[in-house]
């Protein structure tokens, strides 16, 4: 007769409230989606959100409104952790860049600096072929 294995309770890591007043908002805006990650100055993630994670699907993910909603959701969680001011670094060519920055300011976070960190090749890889529609 086989012995029954005792059920072990799965341990879930409880989110502890970090007290971080200054942070960095990394906004990655592509042609398909916008991802907003808010970190502490060392780069440890405090909160994140994206247009896709909020339920936007397909071409709606790439809209400025979806980027605005993603930035608001990430900012709300960051403010619960005590964040007051931000430095914003924006990467990518997408439509949601400015909308995400504006919504971060509208939530009550103080934006100290905005920098564009879009990678620009010094004639590196060959780009994809031109689309013919």
Swiss-Prot record:
Family: Belongs to the universal ribosomal protein uS11 family.
Species this protein is from: Brevibacillus brevis (strain 47 / JCM 6285 / NBRC 100599)
GO biological process, one term: translation
UniProt GO MF annotations: rRNA binding; structural constituent of ribosome
Name of the protein in question: Small ribosomal subunit protein uS11
GO cellular component, one term: ribosome
Primary gene name: rpsK
Function: Located on the platform of the 30S subunit, it bridges several disparate RNA helices of the 16S rRNA. Forms part of the Shine-Dalgarno cleft in the 70S ribosome.
Record InterPro entries: Ribosomal_uS11, Ribosomal_uS11_bac-type, Ribosomal_uS11_CS, Ribosomal_uS11_sf
Keywords, ordered alphabetically: Ribonucleoprotein, Ribosomal protein, RNA-binding, rRNA-binding
Gene3D superfamilies: Ribosomal protein S11
Subunit structure: Part of the 30S ribosomal subunit. Interacts with proteins S7 and S18. Binds to IF-3.
């Amino acid at each position: 007769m086989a012995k029954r294995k005792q059920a072990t309770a799965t341990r879930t890591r409880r989110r502890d409230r970090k007290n971080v007043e200054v942070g960095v908002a990394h906004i990655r805006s592509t042609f398909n989606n916008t991802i907003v990650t808010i970190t502490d100055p060392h780069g440890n993630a405090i909160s994140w959100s994206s247009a896709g994670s909020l339920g936007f699907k397909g071409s709606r993910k790439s809209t400025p409104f979806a980027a605005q909603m993603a930035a608001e959701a990430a900012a709300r969680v960051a403010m619960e952790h005590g964040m007051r001011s931000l430095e914003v670094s924006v990467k990518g060519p997408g439509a949601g860049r400015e909308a995400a920055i504006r919504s971060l300011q509208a939530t009550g976070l103080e934006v100290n600096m905005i920098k564009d960190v879009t990678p620009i090749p010094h004639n590196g890889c060959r780009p994809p072929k031109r689309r013919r529609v």
